[in-house]
């Protein structure tokens, strides 16, 4: 899957680009990735390295998620990908979120496909 153009960044006078998505304000040189490992400078622009790629898909009861009183009794279509700008030692997905191995992201689906499959399975949320 091709790398997807990213939003929320701007060019700097020194040839780098700055990510404006989170408070880390990563300033990247060509080929460099941000702290999240998801956003990269390529060809003078910001691209997403994991767009449309996932470490897996699953339908879960909403109660399994850290969402209090959100559609009680419903199902959620869950998926995950590598990349996170945090470094929480207690994170249950630390090995995935901090993975630098893009081969772990073996499943692929566009946002439209994810929404379609979630609706087909009666999931009220993604």
Report the location of each language-model feature.
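Flexible, acidic/Gly-rich N-terminal and inter-domain linker regions that tether
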Residues: 1-74
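Conserved Radical SAM active-site core
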Residues: 41-126
């Amino acid at each position: 899957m091709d790398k997807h153009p990213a939003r929320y960044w701007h060019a700097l006078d020194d040839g780098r680009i700055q990510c404006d998505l989170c408070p880390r304000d990563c300033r990247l040189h060509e080929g460099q990735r941000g702290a999240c490992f998801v956003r990269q400078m390529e060809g003078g622009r910001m691209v997403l390295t994991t767009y449309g790629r996932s470490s897996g898909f699953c339908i879960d009861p909403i109660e399994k998620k850290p969402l209090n009183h959100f559609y009680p009794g419903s199902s959620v279509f869950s998926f995950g990908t590598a990349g996170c700008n945090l470094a929480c030692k207690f994170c249950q997905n630390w090995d995935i979120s901090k993975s630098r191995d893009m081969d772990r992201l073996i499943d692929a689906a566009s946002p439209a496909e994810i929404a379609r499959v979630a609706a087909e399975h009666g999931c009220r949320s993604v």
